[in-house]
């Protein structure tokens, strides 16, 4: 009933080399010699005979019990098919979700206070021309620079803030004129 296993040579892997090195201990032989010696020892070693007490209770199993166990394992090996995922159901399956109405923002921000924005654009164009003469010179008024005013004034809706942008851009133009 018990079949003897024939051992193959140990493949040279990191784990096996570590085992060989550990087996060597403090001996002065090379790894190759230790590998050959270990291979020889493993070749001489045979598989131990099967234990008569193979059950967990410590009692040996009869041949009938072994056959029953093997039949049960074969039956358990067949797995049931996987359960399909459930689809998410809506509360009212007959009704489709209503489309949202687009929001009406009124007049776009770039259309508000157009005359004031044109004045700011004229001043910013003069600043751009002045900045080309001396590109390293970048003055600021109240932490506002030419690029920051350029980015923000088009989208501003408040006329007071736009008036402040116009005043700041005029002051910046004066600083650019002085610096040149």
From Swiss-Prot:
Record protein name field: Putative protein 33K
Lineage, top ranks: Viruses, Varidnaviria, Bamfordvirae, Preplasmiviricota, Tectiliviricetes
Compositional bias per record (Acidic residues), positions renumbered to this chain: 60-78
InterPro entries assigned to the protein according to its UniProt record, in alphabetical order: Adeno_L4-33K/L4-22K (IPR021304)
GO process annotations (BP): viral DNA genome packaging
Basic and acidic residues compositional bias, start-end: 33-43
Pfam family, one: Adeno_L433K_22K
Region (Disordered): 31-108
Superkingdom of the source species: Viruses
Coiled coil: none
């Amino acid at each position: 009933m018990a079949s003897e296993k024939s051992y193959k040579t140990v493949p040279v892997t990191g784990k096996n080399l570590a085992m060989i090195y550990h087996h060597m201990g403090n001996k002065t032989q090379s790894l190759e010699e230790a590998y050959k010696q270990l291979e020889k020892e493993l070749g001489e070693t045979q598989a131990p005979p099967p234990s008569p007490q193979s059950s967990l209770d410590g009692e040996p199993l009869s041949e009938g019990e072994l056959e029953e166990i093997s039949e049960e394992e074969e039956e358990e090996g067949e797995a049931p098919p996987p359960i399909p995922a459930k689809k998410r159901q809506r509360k009212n399956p007959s009704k489709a979700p209503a489309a949202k109405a687009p929001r009406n923002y009124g007049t776009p921000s770039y259309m508000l206070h157009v005359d004031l924005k044109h004045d700011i654009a004229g001043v910013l164009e003069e600043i751009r021309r002045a900045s080309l003469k001396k590109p390293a010179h970048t003055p600021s008024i109240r932490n506002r620079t030419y690029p920051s005013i350029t980015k923000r004034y088009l989208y501003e809706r408040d006329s007071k803030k736009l008036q402040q942008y116009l005043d700041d851009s005029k002051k910046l133009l004066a600083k650019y004129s002085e610096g040149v």
